[in-house]
Swiss-Prot record:
One of its GO terms (molecular function) is RNA binding. The gene is G3bp2. Scaffold protein that plays an essential role in cytoplasmic stress granule formation which acts as a platform for antiviral signaling. Plays an essential role in stress granule formation. Stress granules are membraneless compartments that store mRNAs and proteins, such as stalled translation pre-initiation complexes, in response to stress. This is Ras GTPase-activating protein-binding protein 2. Under physiological conditions, G3BP2 adopts a compact state that is stabilized by intramolecular interactions between the RG-rich and the acidic regions that inhibit phase separation. Upon stress, polysomes disassemble and mRNAs are released in an unfolded protein-free state. Residues 404-476 are annotated as: RG-rich region. The modification Phosphothreonine is found at residue 227. It comes from Mus musculus (Mouse). The modification Phosphoserine is found at residues 141, 149, 225, 466.
């Protein structure tokens, strides 16, 4: 009887089931999956803030696993990718949530390279194992979102919450129900990761939705008028000329559809242009365009384009204006990797040695105390900022290395944000296209979510004490025979 070679996906799924089951029930035997030449790295940072280095060999991996103190380790697998690699090996990528010793769940990414064991067909061992927590990898990029003047970010969210958020949630839920897992990117996890890059796309959706809401409002006001249709087309033909003034900034974010002309930016400029056409009508019809002029003027004042100090015509309170235009970016310094027990007075005294500190604030990340804090320091001059940047690395209390960076200009943040958003949208389009691999993994590792239980366990068995390892302490798993 000819033995069929199992597919990489079948090998990957069975390995994932065995590996995380052993991690939960008997982590002290986890090293049996590895061999003499295996490498193992587990997410974490040392005292200096650098990522932990890999360990090699089954014995060192055993000590490393014991030092991690795995106890009642529960894992929720969200996605598994498995592909064939060199020398008949299989590379497996796992994404999900991990909770150890009753701690809150944390998103993780783990990659295995499974090498074939020469003595037995369809038998593999872990040659490389790389594990990282997502919040440790992307933690340093989060403060850039807060750099955009926290006050104006909160104001933008308050203005935009009523319209765009339900649309995004409906879109995500529809995509989630259709195919929970795709080949490489899982959309629900992507949206919940709090990454700042997709913001331009939601901004565009927001700007597209607001004129529609305003037009409905105007239609209700114009029902009492004799001819409501001419009032709306009057503004539409005039919008393209204004769009050219923003083309160099927003062309990357505007979709190539008919909704470009109805973006939320130009309408407040179009209303005065359309007035001469409306003035030819009775005076009753001239009122709705004036309402149209007033309403959009409050919202487009907040997008982070153009110089902030020159916008004195925005009807904001004085305290908000003072916070936005008080100090230039060259006087401000971003400080990351702050200890949790630090207070503002201690940090201010530390930076007073470089120059006069006029303002300081510390932000706490809400991840259950797992991540270091970050903050912003404002000097009365740009020279202390440059001295600190030249003097890097900056050591606090003699043992904590602070991550200090100059506050980036608004143009640089927009370029980075928009560039990342375009690439991410392209990836999502490719993943959501027809004929995609949604059916390959959807019925396998996602069974826990649907309540149908894990895959059948009769396919592969764990064999201990043979192969390339160190005698009885080395474990292997084999593919099923068909």
């Amino acid at each position: 009887m000819v033995m069929e070679k199992p597919s990489p996906l079948l090998v990957g799924r069975e390995f994932v089931r065995q590996y995380y089951t052993l991690l939960n029930k008997a982590p002290e035997y986890l090293h049996r999956f590895y061999g003499r030449n295996s490498s193992y790295v587990h997410g974490g940072v040392d005292a200096s803030g650098k990522p932990q280095e890999a360990v090699y060999g089954q014995n060192d991996i055993h000590h490393k696993v014991l030092s991690l103190n795995f106890s009642e380790c529960h894992t929720k697998i969200r996605h598994v990718d498995a592909h064939a690699t060199l020398s008949d090996g299989v590379v497996v990528q796992v994404m999900g949530l991990l909770s150890n010793s009753g701690q809150p769940e944390r998103k993780f990414m783990q990659t295995f390279v499974l090498a074939p064991e020469g003595s037995v067909p369809n038998k593999f061992y872990v040659h490389n194992d790389m594990f990282r927590y997502e919040d440790e990898v992307f933690g340093d990029s989060e403060p850039e979102l807060d750099e955009e003047s926290e006050d104006e970010v909160e104001e933008e969210q308050e203005d935009r919450q009523p319209s765009p958020e339900p649309v995004q949630e409906n879109a995500n839920s529809a995509y989630y129900d259709a195919h929970p897992v795709t080949n490489g990117i899982e959309e629900p996890l992507e949206e919940s990761s709090h990454e700042p890059e997709p913001e331009p796309e939601s901004e565009t959706k927001t700007e597209e939705l607001k004129p529609q809401v305003e037009e409905k409002h105007l239609e209700e006001l114009e029902e009492k008028s004799a001819t409501p249709p001419p009032a709306e087309p009057a503004s539409l033909p005039q919008e393209p000329p204004k769009a050219f003034s923003w083309a160099s900034v927003t062309s990357k974010n505007l979709p190539p559809s008919g909704t470009v002309s109805s973006s939320g930016i130009p309408p407040h400029v179009k209303a005065p242009v359309s007035q001469p056409r409306v003035d030819a009508k009775p005076e009753v019809q001239s009122q709705p365009p004036r309402v149209r002029e007033q309403r959009p003027r409050e919202r487009p004042g907040f997008p982070p384009r153009g110089p902030r100090p020159g916008r004195g015509d925005m009807e904001q309170n004085d305290s908000d204006n003072r916070r936005i235009i008080r100090y230039p970016d060259s006087h401000q310094l971003f400080v990351g990797n702050l200890p949790h027990d630090i207070d503002e007075n201690e940090l201010k005294e530390f930076f007073m040695s470089f120059g006069n500190v006029v303002e300081l604030r510390i932000n706490t990340k809400g991840v259950g105390g797992k991540l270091p804090n970050f903050g912003f320091v404002v000097f009365d001059d740009s020279e202390p900022v440059q001295r600190i940047l030249i003097a890097k690395p900056i050591m606090f209390r003699g043992e904590v290395r602070l991550n200090v960076e100059e506050k980036k200009t608004r143009a640089a943040r927009e370029r980075e944000t928009r560039g990342g958003g375009d690439d991410r949208r392209d990836i999502r389009r490719n993943d959501r296209g027809p004929g995609g691999p949604r059916g390959i993994v959807g019925g396998g590792m996602m069974r826990d979510r649907d309540g149908r239980g894990p895959p059948p366990r009769g396919g592969m068995t764990q064999k201990l004490g043979s192969g390339r390892g160190t005698g009885q302490m080395e474990g292997r798993f084999t593919g099923q025979r068909r």
